Amino acid sequence: MTKDDLSFIFEDELEKGICPKCRKNKTEVDFFTGEDILCTDCRKLINKEIGYDTLKQNANVPKAYYIYSWRNYDENFFKKIVEATNRFKNNLHLVGGSFTGKTVLMIACIDYLIKYGENSILFYNVPELLTNAQKECYSYYNYLINKCSHIRFLFLDDIFNGLNSSENKFLYEILDYRNRNNLPTVSATNVKINDARIYSRLLRNNGVEIEINSKFWRKANER
């Protein structure tokens, strides 16, 4: 197992169509439109042409984190993550203290997804997301719920306890929709989530919780 051999994690089991761009590779069919989706090879090429940093910006990744990828990780820790990730179908929940590398791990997942050809990705720091949802107008509140609910891969960093009723409703609505529609959510926290409804939806659909106790990632300039 190498750090570039991660394709099995995100491969779709159903391959029914032919790529409409290259007309040679097998691909999946869009559930809603019935049309063939671009194959992985074509999506990879398109993302490379757009630019990885541009796609990270579109995904709301903080600029300071653009440099991080799977190569920032200790080899032994990497193997443990691959093993755990191979077991989860939709949701992945990271738990650990401050400065243990949870956010960097999430960014490494995003980096891999982009290089694998995905572009329907969003990253949000939860306190910032909730603040934006409450201070803006009602239409923007609904826009954020719709955006977070329907994106293919959602990454929620720094989930915390003590949500007020409106914050709880906002987060619950997003997570519940994603679970019902089998959309993957990757979350991270440095506390034990004590809200049973929120916690259960972070781990539904064969979700996996990984506890991170040590700082296993390396700085980019130490690769």
Model-derived regions: residue spans:
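Short glycine-rich substrate-engagement loop in P-loop NTPases that contacts/grips substrate
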Residues: 79, 114-150
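Pre-Walker A adenine-sensing motif
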Residues: 77-87
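Alpha-helical transmembrane segments of helical membrane proteins, especially in multi-pass transport
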Residues: 153-154, 161
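A short, basic N-terminal segment
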Residues: 1-79, 210, 217-223
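Walker A/P-loop nucleotide-binding motif
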Residues: 89-107
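P-loop NTPase Walker A phosphate-binding motif
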Residues: 104-118
